[in-house]
Design a protein with these regions (language model features):
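Sec-dependent bacterial lipoprotein signal peptides
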Residues: 1-20
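Short alpha-helical boundary/capping segments at helix-coil junctions
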Residues: 2-4, 22-65, 93-149
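Sequence-composition feature that favors extended, apolar/low-complexity stretches
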Residues: 77-83
Length: 149
């Protein structure tokens, strides 16, 4: 199993465990997450309840601009490496906090990994809030990995 695929497997396992515990609701409770299709896009919008955000431990950090001295190819955006998620074909993504309790997956191109920082060749702009803790669980929610309808 390649490094890329073992990372995906690790994310999927974590997502199943967390989402199963987060997905149980009673008739009086709202579902923990709503997945809404966005017109003209194949990437949906995820809206979580406050309780789901708390249970998943969602944490965000803003995209930062790398100092020119830190990156030999000039100014690039940087994010914490844990914000990067991989889908089944190895594509790299981040979840951007687009509104209150709302997240949307956005493609990124990782130019380099320097310790716990991913240097981006393309991705969200400086200042955008990316999910650094809980991104794998959001991917599981988007793809309904828990198997619940």
């Amino acid at each position: 199993m390649s490094m890329k695929h073992s990372a995906v497997a690790g994310f999927a396992v974590g997502a199943i465990v967390v989402l199963t515990s987060c997905a149980s609701t009673t008739a009086a409770e709202a579902p923990p997450a709503t997945v809404t299709r966005v017109a003209g896009s194949q990437i949906p919008r995820l809206q979580l309840t406050d309780r789901a955000i708390q249970r998943l431990g969602i944490v965000t950090r803003p995209v930062a601009e790398a100092p020119a001295a830190a990156v030999s190819m000039g100014q690039r955006e940087i994010i914490p490496y844990p914000a990067v998620v991989y889908d089944t074909d190895g594509s790299t993504w981040v979840y951007v906090n687009t509104a209150t309790r709302t997240y949307r997956r956005q493609p990124v191109t990782v130019a380099a990994i320097q310790g716990d920082v991913a240097v981006l060749a393309s991705g969200p702009p400086v200042g955008a809030a990316v999910v650094t803790v809980g991104a794998a669980e959001l991917l599981g929610t988007e793809y309904n990995i828990s198997g619940e309808e």
